[in-house]
Amino acid sequence: MSDRYLTFANSSTGRRLVGALGLPAPVRLERWMAGRVRPVDGALLLGGEGELLQAVMPFANKLTDQLFSARDGQFDLPRWTAEHGPKLKALVFDASHLTRFEQLIELRDFFQPTFKGLANSPRVVVLGRAPESLKDPVAASVQRSLEGFTRSLGKEIRRGGSVQLLYIGKGGEQQLEGALR
């Protein structure tokens, strides 16, 4: 969609006309601006229990000034709740510890309450282990299923959001900061 259509569709007259004709109403996407101190301009929610989240914690405060945890007492961060927490600009879920299909319920338990609390142009990152690096075939299948989950999540996110799945191999934890910036 061109910029002229975006401008028109977001004007007061354009909104009425676009709605009446059933045309798509594009969202103005948030772009990087020079001089921004931190990559995430808003609240960041961390979830999951894997070792990759442990690797994120040393630099998490460089990403944003509003860090929250999905659980009480995790990393000494305040717990985010949909009723009382701020709108979320980014979510990071570490799924590297998921090795059995029964554990995939943790994805729903984390993401379902957060979707109503997302700000415009949110960024969602799911961290997993490279399936080919796992010896257990069930664990490899569980990690591969994260791809389908993130594709589905990407279709549901709305408001100009993006969803990424990062498969991290053993020893790749040192590059996480660059990937999350």
List each model region and its residues.
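Glycine-rich nucleotide cofactor-binding loops and adjacent beta-alpha elements
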Residues: 1-181
